[in-house]
A protein has these predicted regions:
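Acyl-donor (CoA/ACP) binding surface of acyl/acetyltransferases
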Residues: 7-112
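Active-site rim helix/loop that mediates acceptor-substrate recognition in acyltransferases
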Residues: 1-7
Length: 112
């Protein structure tokens, strides 16, 4: 991490059941004014139900209110259609397609 960079996260519950995590890492309020986002829903049967989309919308709003950042970035593999769909549905735009360790990947951003 850069000096002054932070991380912040929350657990995701569906009913009373812990089903995943969402977090921002590398939160930089000084230089780049940005953070990076990660989210995981553990149980495949809960994918596609809007749970991750709602958690992402709520969490991003909270991060923009809590931290002095202008954008949030996210990486995903180009073959991960669900992740790309989630990010685009919640306001992220594709910025760059690149190859990492032989795998096509995508970088997306959402601006304040």
């Amino acid at each position: 991490f850069k000096d002054g960079a932070l991380s912040y996260g929350k657990v995701i519950y569906y009913g009373n059941k812990y089903i995943g995590d969402i977090w921002c890492y590398g939160i930089d309020e000084i230089n780049e004014k940005m953070a990076m986002l990660s989210i995981v829903i553990f149980e495949k049967e809960l994918w596609g139900k809007g749970i991750a989309a709602q958690a992402t919308k709520d969490f991003i709003k909270e991060v923009f209110n809590k931290y002095d950042v202008e954008k949030i970035g996210a990486f995903t593999y180009a073959f991960n259609d669900r992740s790309i769909g989630l990010l685009e549905k919640t306001g992220f735009s594709k910025i760059e397609i690149f190859i990492e360790d032989g795998i096509e990947s995508i970088y997306l951003e959402k601006h304040r």
